[in-house]
Amino acid sequence: MRRRTMLLSCTTVALALGATACGGGDPVTTAGGGDKPLSGQTVSVAGSWSGAEQKNFQKVLDAFSAKTGAKTQFTSTGDNVSTVVGSKIEGGNAPDVALVPQVGVLQQFAKKGWLKPLSASANQAVDTNYADVWKSYGSVDGSLYGLYFKAAHKSTVWYSPAALEQAGVKPPKTYKEMLASARAVSDSGLSAFAVAGEDGWTLTDWFENIYLSQAGPEKYDQLAAHEIKWTDPSVVKALTTLGALFNEKGLIAGGQKGALGTDFPGSVEQVFGPDPEAGMVYEGDFVAGVAKDQFGRTIGEDAEFFPFPAVDSGRAPVVSGGDAAVVLKDGGNQKGAMALVEFLATPEAAGVWAEAGGFVSPNTKLDLAKYGDDTTRRIAQSLIDAGDSARFDMSDQAPAAFGGTKGTGEWKLLQDFLRDPSDPEATAGRLEAAAAKAYQG
């Protein structure tokens, strides 16, 4: 599930949209004007971004204003995008554009009739600038509703170069090599991996990368849609692979018990903090921001990554997430809203944020030179190279009761599995029982 703003403190504020949300803030309005197509109009936008992300997206909105003459008003909803936007739609005060972070939310909004299909121009831009898989994740029943503007690459293993050098190993190319490197790191005096078991979503990401590589994209899609059961042999195999790592002594900082008491920021600290306990931490590209901003690491020098390696004979996985721009039917400025989404589909818009940093785009036409450092370029290139084999975070596609609720569903069951990984088949059975209930609901 979504985790970007989990690193931020929560403040209850009154949103301009008329609801209360964690992480929200006062709306920011940009000035338009001039003799331009949308002069005198205002486009209201709602999304989860706050802090540096909101500031950088504002630069994109400013570029839109300069191009069209429209004013823009952005309101941060915190992590409660679906709740805040949904309540305002039902209350007759919808924003013009919303940025939704989950496929399931986009599908929910579309099926309720809240979204306007994107224009022919937006469709053409997506066909030209994006791999087909991104159009698929933005579509419901054959109509395109969502434009994926910002992506997250969740198949990156971050490491301390000093730790790997001390162990005498180089970044691995296969999962088998990664385990061998992990044992060498452990033998050199550090634990191999920091695992944020307190945050169940990190465990779903571990599973998804192993499963996508082992079982392949077709099976991944079937499991994401619950077209096959979680008791399928492919699931048991992936759990067995993951369980072997969890269970091997010395590979996890603090052991299984310690991992269950470690949250995501804590796992990054265990590798990149002042007193390192581990050499590697698996999670998405957002690890870099924590390592840099909280622990003063220089990305590409004393904090690096390697792609999550291929498992068995499979292909190296690319699991992603992203934020899709949608146009609300009940918004007051349909023309301006559609123009904004059409702008977001361009490499010009993506380039604005790419230059600001903290951003990866699935837009294949974005010049990689726009990114400010080689590490981000590598991450972006990997996402583009994956093409249609990239897959969206599976738990973000599932009903929240199964894939996105703390203390229940997949999060809780994989925490139980981390605690005791001795019976993958039993865990698969419990996952299937929880999934069946959630998907029926």
What are these regions (language model features)?
Residues 359-365, 380-435:
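C-terminal capping/gating helix-and-loop segments adjacent to ligand/active sites or protein-protein/ligand interfaces
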Residues 62, 293-359:
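Extracytoplasmic/periplasmic substrate-recognition and gating elements
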Residues 145-149, 179-237:
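Extracytoplasmic/periplasmic solute-binding protein
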Residues 217-294:
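Extracytoplasmic ligand-binding clamshell segments of periplasmic binding protein
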Residues 76-84, 103-104, 175-179, 256-270, ...:
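Short helix-initiation/N-cap motifs at beta->coil->alpha
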Residues 103-155, 179:
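Hinge/lid segment of periplasmic solute-binding proteins
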Residues 2-19, 23-107, 124, 352, ...:
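Conserved N-terminal structural module of periplasmic/extracytoplasmic solute-binding proteins
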Residues 36, 119-130, 197, 214-238, ...:
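Short, solvent-exposed loop/beta-turn-alpha elements that line the ligand-binding surface or hinge
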